[in-house]
Amino acid sequence: MKIRINDLARELEVKSKAILDALTKVGVTEKKTHSSSIEDHEAVLVKKYIHEHGTEESPRRRSAGEDEFKPKIDLSKISKPGDVLKALTQKAAPPPPPPPPPRPAVKAPSPVSQEPRPPAVPPAPQKPAVFARPASETVHTPPEPPKPRFITPASVAAQRPVITPPKPPVPPAPPVAVAPPAVIEPAAPAEEPKAAAPATTAPEAPEVKAPVSPERVAPAADTGAHVTAKPEAPAAPGAATPAPTPGRPLPGVPLRQQTPGRRMIVPQTGPRPVYSAPPPAPPRPTPPPQMSQGAGTRPGMPVRGQPIFQRRPQSGPGGGSGGPGGFQRPGGPPRPGDRPRGPHPTRQFPSGPRPMGGIGLAPPGAPANKPAGRPAPARRPGQRYVPRGQKEGPMKGFVPPPRLSLSNEPLPITRNITISEGISVKDLAEKLGIRAKDLIARLLARGVFATVNQTLEASLASEMANHFGASTDVITFEDQLAQETAKAAGETPEEAAANAVVRPPVVTIMGHVDHGKTSLLDAIRATDVAGGEAGGITQHIGAYKVAIGDPNSPAFGREIVFLDTPGHEAFTRMRARGSKITDIVVIVVAADDGVMPQTVEAIDHARAANVPIIVAVNKIDKPDAMPERVKKQLADRGLMPEDWGGNTVFVDVSAKQKTNLNLLMEMICLVADLGDLKANPDRMASGTVVEAKLDRGRGPVATVLVQNGTLRTSDNFVVGNAFGKVRAMFNDRGVSLDTAGPSTPVEIIGLETLPQAGDQFTVVADREKARDISEYREGRAREAQLAKSSRVSLEGLAEQLKTAGQKDLPIILKGDVQGSVEVLNDLLSKMSTEKVKITMIRSGVGAITESDVLLASASNAIIIGFNVRPERKAQELAVQEGVDIRLHSIIYELQDEMKKAMLGLLEPIIKETYQGRADVKDTFRIPKVGTIAGCQVADGIIKRDSHVRLVRDNVVIYTGKIGSLKRFKDDASEVRNGMECGIGIAGYGDIRSGDVIEAFTSEKIAADSLH
């Protein structure tokens, strides 16, 4: 059974702290609180200890007087609210003490000090009042009912009755100022009276001072009458001891300690000492009126402790210049009959600020020149002191952050850090060794609102790092992953090199179109890839892995990866991309054609990629083959054959006859061995996207070349702006794979979106990290596209004005693979001229869909499909909307058709043919016909259906058609040179003698050029 410490404290009527202290005394070492529980035997020990030793009271409780602890009042018989007050009154009123027997007068105990002194000064009255009757009249008050005994200064001093001698003429008393309660007025020095007067003391009587009691000073009981407080003095020597007053002890009798009753709360500001009258102050010079506010202040300014409005009272009774309480002239005596008037509560005391302070007055001991301001609130009893500026409660200990303007100065650069693209605020703060909220505050001052997980641009991250004293090296996300992987593996560069193994070389085949690149690859792979290409032309990159199967070859069993690139001039980007991911470039040149433009371009790409070049001279089986001419042409381009003393390998091959194919592969392996191609298969995979396409049944599909590490199914990866998870992998022959080592081309499924060809492929362990990087890159690409499309400049405006009359041909392009779409985009954009501009509305990979048809209908565009077909519903919708869909599989045909479409947009050309000229000899007017010109044909022939121009003074006046042509009175179809005729111009009659009429014909012909 357990008992709570709170319950035990209430049972023993002690505080919980006493229980906790007793627990330590009885041997309980376990830490307890007031809400903890203890066992029964521990409670017994605590009770025994408290009964034997008691509890330690607090210093405040020990220092409290006996009267602080009052007995309780029994409220069990209370039935209505009035009984509570009655019980309190009975409890507080002690029984009156029995009257003491009469005894002779004795000297007052120590509280009364009798010292011979000149004129005695009575103690100041406790509550001065204005005399309502003559000063000599004594006011008798009825006896007071029994009240609680309070120790007052008056009760300590000897109480004696006032002896009233005969009443001589009383001189006018000095004016006594009336002050509010709790303010002690100093009494004027007592003058020696000629005769005894009430409230006066004989000259030889010693002064009686009332000691300052530490107890509370009780105010006098209100009897309902105006009482004139008079100072009491000791009786003359030999005077009889007066009878005791009811309710008061005899003089000199010590007070009997009474039983403590209920403490009464008396509203007092503090103990009031009794002051004796100060000596008369010397007269002070009257200050000038304008300086009455106080020294050092401007006239009219309010002064601390002075009334705000120092107005001069008006004359008249109670306020006139000489009336009672009226304005007193400075330094002048009061007029006879004037009654004193109390000062304003905020007016300074005549001798300075009051000792006890007050509203608007300086407290005792305060400096006189304390600046004015709002007074500090007084602390409640028991409230501890809290320094200004410190917070309490839930905000205790909170330190506000420094103002942003205080840390605008950047720190000196003392270190270097490496950051990646799209670094988050949290990661950057960790690299800088600062708190994330400090970095966010700096970004906020920069005008950037960012959260902890928000990514930052590389430029902004570098700026923030420089501000906090660090320089930066920006790397890509793939480089960062490679560094983290190497760091996690804990390998040194030497160990990493030792763990690397030889990988198959990646060979890219380049050359001019129709020089036999794909046929050569087919002969090596023993397949027919070229037969499947449209028109026998390779139009996208193909990746294949081939193993040397000739047992007689020294390279038997080795593998080679081949990349087949297009040879058409439009596929420059594909060739450039293929050269970047390759180890060796094989330039295929036809022996009968020689070096062609795309051959030179392929050589330039290989040199730019700094990869070795092998030349394969194909078609040597043809009768007109000239391999030596090819060597000479390439030697002029800088590729010197080995048999001519150079370092370029030349191999004469025939794809059709399969001649020297093993020799070509052996040379490839030899050059690869010189390059020391190695990779670490134990790392996470990384590579490059060769091609990407959108499959109808499988979704986005990408052909990836693994360059390092091993790719496995279920791996998460990032590739450009896309990310995904490897759902399945297939090799170049369509066989499913679970793993793919270095230098292995695979087709992967599991992409969220379609990547771009040439993007870096990297496997990551965290899918969320891959998603964040993908979203960051996609957002950056979108922002760049919007900025590019919305940018307006003066040059752009001038270009728009220049091409205001330019025709626009909108196109929607769909292709089978991403590489082909990129190539066609570049090709069509280059076909734009000053007269016709091709606008690409949308381009993408996949079949033609209904959304493509609707977009084409809204924008009046033509849909072009390259190696793709429209869906059935899309075809029906295109017929309904009247959208033109053009399908192509060969790039040449697409290029020719686009030229025809562009020419069809141009306006037809108007061609004029000159026929003849006639001179006007005279004119005459025929009613209902108009003006007829009598002409003579001077040159050529004038026909009835000809167009004519009327020329006057070598200026064309009118152009129209012949309305009538007559020879004499007969209509004529034509009039030849030298003959006269009458010519009427349709709709025109202002013909004059001497004009010339020229006849011509016009015809429209189609534009034959785009320039």
Swiss-Prot record:
Amino acid composition bias (Basic and acidic residues), ranges on this chain: 49-77
Compositional bias ranges of the Gly residues kind: 316-329
Domain tr-type G: 502-678
Pfam family, one: EF-G_D2
Chain positions covered by the region annotation G3: 564-567
Disordered, as annotated region: 49-152, 187-407
Keyword Cytoplasm: yes
Sequence ranges of Pro residues compositional bias: 93-104, 116-126, 243-252, 276-290
Domain of life from the UniProt record: Bacteria
Keyword flag Cytoplasm: yes
Record region (G2): 536-540
GO molecular function term, any single one: GTP binding
Annotated InterPro entries: EF-G-like_DII, EFTu-like_2, IF2_II, IF2_N, P-loop_NTPase, Small_GTP-bd, T_Tr_GTP-bd_dom, TF_IF2_bacterial-like
Chain intervals for the UniProt region annotation (G5): 654-656
Gene3D superfamilies in UniProt: 1.10.10.2480, P-loop containing nucleotide triphosphate hydrolases, Translation factors, Translation initiation factor IF- 2, domain 3
Residue span of region G4: 618-621
Task performed by this protein: One of the essential components for the initiation of protein synthesis. Protects formylmethionyl-tRNA from spontaneous hydrolysis and promotes its binding to the 30S ribosomal subunits. Also involved in the hydrolysis of GTP during the formation of the 70S ribosomal complex.
HAMAP family according to UniProt: IF_2_B
Family designation: Belongs to the TRAFAC class translation factor GTPase superfamily. Classic translation factor GTPase family. IF-2 subfamily.
Name of the featured protein: Translation initiation factor IF-2
Gene: infB
